[in-house]
Amino acid sequence: MNISKVRIATLSIGLAVGSMALQSCDSLTKTQKGAGIGAAAGGVVGALIGKKAGNTAVGALIGGAIGGTAGAFIGRRMDRQAAEIQKAIPNAEVIREGEGIIVKFDSGILFDFDKTALKDAAKTNVQSLAASLNQYPDTDIKVIGHTDSRGTEVYNQGLSERRAAAVKAYAVSQGVPSSRLVTIGKGFAEPIADNETDAGRAANRRVEIVIVANDALKSTAQKQG
């Protein structure tokens, strides 16, 4: 599976009239898009990426962006890391936009149905991801668990939390500092597909790992300009 390419709209400022209009920027690199993302454009980015990931993941991606030259510096690092993750874990979906990365696993890749223990094959995937996180230590990570809508809200909330915790625990066992990882369970609150179909429910059962620059990397990036 290739790195997901999400079309982004960015801000174009008309200096003569002081007005702003949205335009497509497919010709820009991911890094250039990261440099141009501001508050208004971020909302458009969120709407587009949100078709592939939940609101919590998208919010973390946009909320961590600083834009400008510093954002471009961070974007170049994220370009490299995203490509390496996709090569190492071809069955994951890697969404690379702006100044961050979302790595998405269908829950069937990681867990048996209704279970929270990682499959043996899944441990290899998380081990590969942990190796990348250790290679790029100046990032913060959110691990977000999601379920489909079958079952009660309370049960699914707990299931999503336990699955996120299982991914974190294995990453920590592979040397990733626990302090870098935050787990979040969203139950069935953030579907990305129709829960009325088997395919939709399968898409909604997922774990999203969001990778963004930490404060140290942002500080380094801001000094580059």
Q: What kind of region is each of these model predictions?
A:
Residues 146-220:
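Periplasmic OmpA-like peptidoglycan-binding domain that tethers envelope proteins to the cell wall
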Residues 1-12:
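Bacterial N-terminal signal peptides that target proteins for export
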Residues 87-88, 111-145, 172, 202-204, ...:
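Periplasmic peptidoglycan-binding/anchoring modules of Gram-negative envelope and division proteins
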Residues 35-44, 60, 80, 84, ...:
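Extracytoplasmic/secreted proteins, especially bacterial periplasmic and envelope-associated proteins
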Residues 26-84:
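Short, low-complexity, glycine-enriched hydrophobic/amphipathic alpha-helices that associate
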Residues 78-105, 109:
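Amphipathic, membrane-active segments
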Residues 20-24:
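C-terminal motif of bacterial Sec signal peptides marking the signal peptidase cleavage site
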Residues 47, 51, 72, 76, ...:
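Structured segments of extracytoplasmic/periplasmic soluble domains
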